[in-house]
Amino acid sequence: MIRISEAAQSHFKKLLADQPDGTCIRVFVVNPGMANAECGVSYCPPDSVEPDDERLPFNGFDAVVDSGSAPFLEDAAIDFEEQEMGSQLTLKAPNAKARKVADDAPLIERVEYVIQAEINPQLASHGGQVMISEITDDGVAILQFGGGCNGCSMIDVTLKNGIEKELLERFPEEVKGVRDITDHEPGEHSYY
């Protein structure tokens, strides 16, 4: 479920040495499966461990994950790096914004996962997002843009050079193209 590097394990062990015996670390996701999902790590006193928490043993400490966060922390990794300018703890959780789907899930679910987990985080930096409305019988993904993407003058570049290229590479036998059905209205909300 969660990989914690040796350096991060050592860091947590040092931090937990100053806490009451039995204190764990809790790894969690706030707003799991949503575009605004946030991951975090906190101390978890022994009396805060819930019966349905998943307990993960590591070198000298345990990590706990609540049942609501667990599916969204699949393939998560925590690392700790010391650099000249200081140290940094990183938590990468590729499934925090969208629950990972099985390889044999329906095509629309697999495409939706790629959109939520990989494409929308990039569009969010411009205040935008894209949603899939359907996939036609001939393999065309029908998309609708919102936020800063609605009315953006660069939408054709984003659609063809970004999203279509990614989906064709990921699903070469199933997706044949993309089509934008957004009623684009340029305004102050538009990125460009």
UniProtKB/Swiss-Prot annotation:
Cofactor section: [4Fe-4S] cluster
Biological process per Gene Ontology, one example term: protein maturation
Any one GO molecular-function label of the UniProt entry: 4 iron, 4 sulfur cluster binding
InterPro entries xrefs: Fe/S_biogenesis_protein_NfuA, FeS_biogenesis, FSCA_dom_sf, HesB-like_dom_sf, NIF_FeS_clus_asmbl_NifU_C
SUPFAM superfamilies to which the protein is assigned, alphabetical: Fe-S cluster assembly (FSCA) domain-like (SSF117916), HesB-like domain (SSF89360)
Residue numbers binding [4Fe-4S] cluster: 149, 152
Annotated keywords: 4Fe-4S, Iron, Iron-sulfur, Metal-binding
Co-factor remark: Binds 1 [4Fe-4S] cluster per subunit. The cluster is presumably bound at the interface of two monomers.
Pfam family, one: Fe-S_biosyn
Assembly notes: Homodimer.
Family that this chain belongs to: Belongs to the NfuA family.
Function: Involved in iron-sulfur cluster biogenesis. Binds a 4Fe-4S cluster, can transfer this cluster to apoproteins, and thereby intervenes in the maturation of Fe/S proteins. Could also act as a scaffold/chaperone for damaged Fe/S proteins.
Protein name: Fe/S biogenesis protein NfuA
Organism of provenance: Idiomarina loihiensis (strain ATCC BAA-735 / DSM 15497 / L2-TR)
Source species taxonomy: Bacteria, Pseudomonadati, Pseudomonadota, Gammaproteobacteria, Alteromonadales
